[in-house]
Amino acid sequence: MFVLAHLSDPHLAPLPRPRIAELASKRLSGYLNWLRKRRAIHRSDVLATIVRDLAQARANHIAVTGDLVNIALPAEFENARRWLEALGPPADVSLVPGNHDAYVAAADAARERLWAPYMAGDATSPPPRLREERAFQQPEDFEPQARGQGPSPGAQESTPTSPRKRGEVLGPSMAKGEFDSQRAEEEAAAFPYLRIRGPVALIGVSTAVPTPPFMATGRLGGPQIARMAALLAGTAAQFRVVLIHHPPHVVPRSRLERLVDAAAFREAVAAAGAELVIHGHDHLRSLAWIDGPRGHVPMIGVPSASAAFSTDHDAAGYNIYRIAGHPGNWTCEVVRRGLGADGAVTECERFAV
């Protein structure tokens, strides 16, 4: 049996105190939102509790589906790197970025420099990437380096997602310097990556692109979708797990938060097949299904890993996937664990997909 752990959207706290010059962009609205609301939701102590509980699962591998940071300050990427190292070495942790990890175009360089080993394909089966995987030692503990402010990052409402029709993207034009289409295409060209771990093929895709203020849409792009389809087709003998940040099956409460080319993603999976798609972004426990070439493919979301307990949103949690079987006869048991009102992490649900 192969055990895969999945957490997402840790929105690491505390948020470093930004310099004035760093707020001359979309970061300003994000920082105000943090001060107003999100710092009361995302808490470092909650995240530490979740990670300690996850360690007891003795997973073979850990998948993290994005949004490690909040407003993409340079210091946030340093903190996130240290948190990743505490979670596990690059060979044991697979990461895909989220929209907060691409909050502004200037974040690309820091994300690539500091997180690349966790987003790199196997050296023996390299995807179309320009980076090499490097090994790092895991520190004993993680303490965020904050230049100022303290508490937490954000979650959202607790209604399970359900499939809806995809619409067109309509939004304000980008401020100068906020979006560089060539740079976005170069970033997308580094994905997908492929990692083979036992019977499992982990395929990581990126939906992270800079967007205007008050937008949180994601985009894969046609070339990345085509490369993903090729990797899916080439790993049909494995249990194929696609890691993605934005849920590719719904419009999540707002058209300004969705994956704009979700339909193209679903078409690729319908043609090439996959055994499981896992995502974050909505901060919700969710399960939906899309068509595959031989039956339905489960798409499973998790809440923010740092969300404090509340009746207003899904509290922090993570999933365990227990994978067994062989091609044509795979089994996957899902175990959902989450934070309770008493601050303890317990099993919430168990089911097969």
Regions found by a protein language model. Name each.
Residues 123-186:
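Intrinsic disorder/low-complexity segments
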Residues 235-251:
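Short acidic, glycine-rich surface-loop motifs adjacent to enzyme active sites
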Residues 11-15, 70-73, 99-107, 210-214, ...:
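Active-site environment of divalent metal-dependent phosphoester hydrolases
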Residues 254-327:
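Conserved beta-sheet core of the metallophosphoesterase superfamily
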Residues 1-79, 85:
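N-terminal active-site segment of His-dependent metallophosphoesterases
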Residues 79-127, 141, 178-227, 267-268, ...:
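Extended active-site neighborhood of metal-dependent phosphoesterases/phosphodiesterases
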Residues 323-353:
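A short C-terminal boundary segment appended to hydrolase-like catalytic domains
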Residues 6-8, 61-66, 93-99, 206, ...:
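Active-site neighborhood of phospho(di)ester-bond hydrolases with catalytic His/Asp-centered motifs
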